[in-house]
Design a protein with these regions (language model features):
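Beta-strand initiation motifs
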Residues: 63-71, 192-194
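N-terminal basic/disordered segments at the start of proteins
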Residues: 40-62, 67
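Helical "lid/coupling" subdomains associated with nucleotide-phosphate turnover
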Residues: 42, 56, 83-114, 119-172, ...
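A short acidic Gly-Thr/Ser loop motif
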Residues: 46-51, 176-182, 238-241
Length: 273
């Protein structure tokens, strides 16, 4: 579902006075295989509304500070948001599949042996009435401590990827992370996070028709208020939908994408959705 993208394009043009570019941002860098023998290995489990992911990376130290090198990523397309956003409860069958997946992730964590790992759940688990019950089951059956984080904490973690390193000293940007259940916006001025907020707008919610006009209005109002006196803001995006557009455009990670390129891609894929 690419519904958020046209809206973002129109808003950038109408309100931000930005250049005709949206820049997808990726905090994980690539490195030669020879570097894989160095550094410290960490792992993370991300329980999203559209999928679950287990991610391994190594942290290498150099003259510019720590560099995060992607080592491996496993994705399980278990859409918790389908249940959570339509019925308010994660079904028994989905819960069973969820726990089975966590067992598999735990086995891989043991095999990779990182120095530490953390597991977090976001929008779907926040909304599900039985979210905490499922957290307890995961702990009892797998030993994994799964943390359901708030939208505010989710935004904080996203901005902690040190995006400021990739910005010029006086560059202003609106960082947009589009997930399955929520979208996190962070306004960065002169390499400092000035404000951030999470909104209940995401690809799964849109597919399930769970996003209201009030949700869109709330996001627009926040952006207008926070950027009223700021000009030349560049949009920087991340998330599965934005990544997919990058792939369809045959762009390499970190490259700029023009608004016209995104509009052209949307026109091509609309007949198939």
């Amino acid at each position: 579902c690419f519904v958020p993208i046209p809206w973002l394009i129109n808003f950038v043009r109408a309100n931000l006075g930005a250049q005709d570019t949206l820049l997808p941002f990726f905090s994980i860098l690539t490195a030669p295989d020879t570097l894989m023998e160095e550094g410290l290995r960490f792992a993370a489990i991300d329980v999203g509304s559209n999928a679950m992911r287990l991610f391994f990376c190594r942290v290498l130290e150099n003259s510019h500070g720590p560099t995060f090198v992607k080592e491996s990523m496993i994705r399980m397309p278990l859409r918790l948001g389908h249940d959570a956003f339509t019925t308010g409860t994660i079904s028994n069958d989905t819960c069973d599949r969820f726990v089975d997946t966590m067992h598999g992730f735990k086995a891989l964590v043991r095999a990779y042996d990182p120095i530490t790992f953390k597991a977090c759940a976001t929008s779907a688990m926040r909304q599900a009435k039985n979210g905490m019950e499922l957290v307890g089951r995961v702990k009892n059956e797998t030993g994994i401590d799964l943390n359901i984080i708030s939208g505010k904490e989710e935004a904080r973690i996203i901005i902690a990827t040190h995006i400021d390193r990739h910005l010029k000293p006086q560059q202003h940007c609106l960082y947009v992370d589009v997930g399955g259940g929520s979208t996190e916006l962070t306004l960065i001025i002169a390499k400092k996070a000035l404000a951030s907020k999470s909104f209940p707008i995401g690809s799964v919610r849109l597919l399930e028709q769970q996003v209201t006009k009030a949700d869109w209005a709330g996001m627009e109002e926040w952006i207008v208020n926070k950027t009223a006196n700021i000009k030349n803001i560049q949009s920087i995006g991340s998330g599965g939908n934005i990544n997919k557009i990058l792939t369809l455009l045959l762009k390499t990670k970190g490259n700029s994408v023009t608004i016209s390129e995104i509009e052209s891609t949307i026109k091509k894929i609309e007949p198939y959705s």
